[in-house]
Every structure is written in C-alpha cells, then in structure tokens.
Amino acid sequence: MKADVVIVGSGPAGIFTALELIKNGSKKKIIMVEKGSSIHKRNCPKSKTKKCVGCEPCNITAGFSGAGAFSDGKLSLSYEVGGDLPSLIGEDFAQSLIDYTDKIYLEFGADTHVEGINQGEKVKEIRKRAIQSGLKLVDCP
C-alpha cells in the first residue's frame, strides 16, 4: 500500500490533520494508522471491575476519535479554559482557533444549543458561589 501522507493515530489531531489536508485541496493519498479497535469493539472492563486493568491499547483512549468517541460532544468555547495556548500564541488567535473548530463541529452536525445562555440569574448565583470558594467562573461563550 502506497501513500503520500501517513497520519499516525486517528484521535482528534489525526482526524483534523486529514480534514485540513483535504479542505486545502490536497490530492495526496492519505492513510491513517490507528492501533485501537473499532468503536464497536472498544469496551472498557472498568465498568465491571471498578478499576483499570491496564488494557493495551486502552479501549477508552485508543481508536478513532480517541476518548472523544465516548463524549457528549460539548466544547469549551473560551480560550480561558484549558492549557497555556493563549500565552503561547495570543488570546485573539487562540479564540479564533476555538471558533474555527466549533464551526467544523457544527458543519458535521453538532448541537447548536449553548448551555446557560438564557439563565442569567442562575449564572450570577453560581458565579457568586464560585468567587466565595476562590474560583473563577469562565463564560463559554
């Protein structure tokens, strides 16, 4: 089997790499290599054993979409949530990447509902309790 591009791993980074190559008009033959099982064969024994038994590869994180395959698809839409990316590339650019990613998810059918938008009083109360506990509540968006 011949390929121009080999993407190792079909987690979010691998999936988005392939998508960006295609969206940017690449005519190259792309192969994705994944060590994990298909989604239908990814069963974690922890639900029965109540502890990790060290499957190799891990049935939660390895496989198409990684652990995201089992998530409900919610994204944090603010650069203030997560790691150090804004300090490396700037807040505006980090936010533009988040917005770009959200747009892709929406193009593929993600739910457009944004939680908490119409619950101003409830959010104020949660923010007050967070501040009292020494926490910062981040609006997303």
What label would you give each PLM region?
Residues 35-42, 46-141:
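Conserved N-terminal/central alpha/beta ligand/cofactor-binding core
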Residues 7-9, 17, 73:
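Conserved structural-core and active-site-/substrate-pathway-adjacent residues in large, well-folded domains
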Residues 18, 22:
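Gly/Ala-rich phosphate-binding loop of Rossmann-like dinucleotide-binding domains
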Residues 12, 28, 43:
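Functionally constrained cores in energy, signaling, and assembly domains
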Residues 23-29:
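Conserved S-adenosyl-L-methionine
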Residues 1-13, 31-33:
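Beta1/beta-strand and adjacent pyrophosphate-binding region of the FAD-binding site
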